[in-house]
């Protein structure tokens, strides 16, 4: 029964999208720390992680540790045959494949997070590896690896968040000046004295104000 359930889970994306999805491929080019291009031409975005940008950010500048993250991804996969596992959503709005990527027994998404080259970034509805990826991030954070060793770009004595709402909604924390923070009702306001406190309470960084953004040494 367990084997049948797993097979149905793996085949579900094929049924929903009605197309042939690659379950392995040779990596022709590493785009950045969380995206690759196969020799067959498909772009693949790693599910559940977010590496620093190398080409641009909201400030039109590369982000700290972007080059290092790209190079780490390159060392892991470039020119090699990788295999894919899919979740409920198999393509994003840019028509990139969304996948959990493996090389041999190495879970590439998790390895990049575990060594501090990328952050855990939950993405609904693709949730099957969330617990594992969060464990990888906690390990990197505890050991101050990679991104976690760099100083914050905008350090703050306080971070704001809203009390948990509907089940399944990702809880976010914000810098004080973030527009989303200003809209939080006083009755629902949660104040954290550190990023670690917010993360330990299950909150994730806002993608608009990006309280985890770092400086290069």
Describe each model-derived feature in a short phrase.
Residues 2-10, 14-217:
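Small beta-barrel nucleic-acid-binding modules, primarily SNase/OB-fold domains
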């Amino acid at each position: 029964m367990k084997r049948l359930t797993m097979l149905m889970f793996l085949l579900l994306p094929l049924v929903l999208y009605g197309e042939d999805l690659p379950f392995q491929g040779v990596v022709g080019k590493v785009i950045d720390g969380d995206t690759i291009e196969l020799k067959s031409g498909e772009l693949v975005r790693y599910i559940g992680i977010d590496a620093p940008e190398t080409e641009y950010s909201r400030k039109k500048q590369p982000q700290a540790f972007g080059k290092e993250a790209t190079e780490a991804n390159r060392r892991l996969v470039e020119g090699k045959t990788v295999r894919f596992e899919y979740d409920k959503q198999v393509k994003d709005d840019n028509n990139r494949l969304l996948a959990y990527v493996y090389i041999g027994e190495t879970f590439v998404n998790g390895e990049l997070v575990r060594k501090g080259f990328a952050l855990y970034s939950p993405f609904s509805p693709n949730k099957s590896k969330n617990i594992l990826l969060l464990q990888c991030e906690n390990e990197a954070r505890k050991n101050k690896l990679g991104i976690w060793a760099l100083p914050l770009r905008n350090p703050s004595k306080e971070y704001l968040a809203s009390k948990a709402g509907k089940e399944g909604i990702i809880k976010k924390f914000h810098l004080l000046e973030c527009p989303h923070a200003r809209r939080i009702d006083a009755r629902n306001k949660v104040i954290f004295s550190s990023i670690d406190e917010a993360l330990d309470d299950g909150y994730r960084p806002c993608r608009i104000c990006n309280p985890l953004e770092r400086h290069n040494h």
